[in-house]
Amino acid sequence: LFPYTTLFRSPFNMYTFNKMWGVVTPEEAAAKIEEQRKEITGEPQNLEEQAISLVGRDIYEKLIKGYTEKQWGRDCKDLPSFIIKRLPVRLTFDNNYFNALYQGIPVGGYTKMIANLLDGIEVRLNIDYLEHKSELDTLADKVVYTGPIDAYFDYKLGTLEYRSVRFETETLDKSNFQGNAAVNYTDRETPWTRIIEHKWFEFGKDENGNDLP
């Protein structure tokens, strides 16, 4: 099942750089990145150039290129540079994606949280807002539309390109499948981007879902 033999930490940090290059200090990692980013001169013009300028070509080729092109269906040279700028790069051993002081996931997951928020609120399903716009707009002072923006404006500026996401759910007779909440598959050949094992999002639980002492 697993098309890989090596695991890297993400977002990119000292664990990533140690596994990729064998470096052990921030100074060594910074020097390695600086050596590889020299091929990019001037302001990066696309995602490939931006990625190389951030972390060097080795990490770009191994962990960014295939994954990104699989997600977007475009060559990295044809994608804008700003897409990759949001990805943290740290010369520390911090694995957190975000820098916020307080971070967390609702106990029981977001489904339970939303269910509690909707308690006592009318919910209508399978209703196309655009087909019933005049009626629905009278129900509130403000309406938040979350559908396709080009459809909202009746495609006056043309049709936007969209990338769809397909979710496949499997229940396995295993207490521990991959040992982590998310494992991303960064090669171009694997036909999926990641596998999620939801139980590991619940902090303070063991592999059987029991509370840790």
Where in this protein do the model-derived segments appear?
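Beta-hairpin (beta-strand-turn-beta-strand) motif
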Residues: 9-11, 195
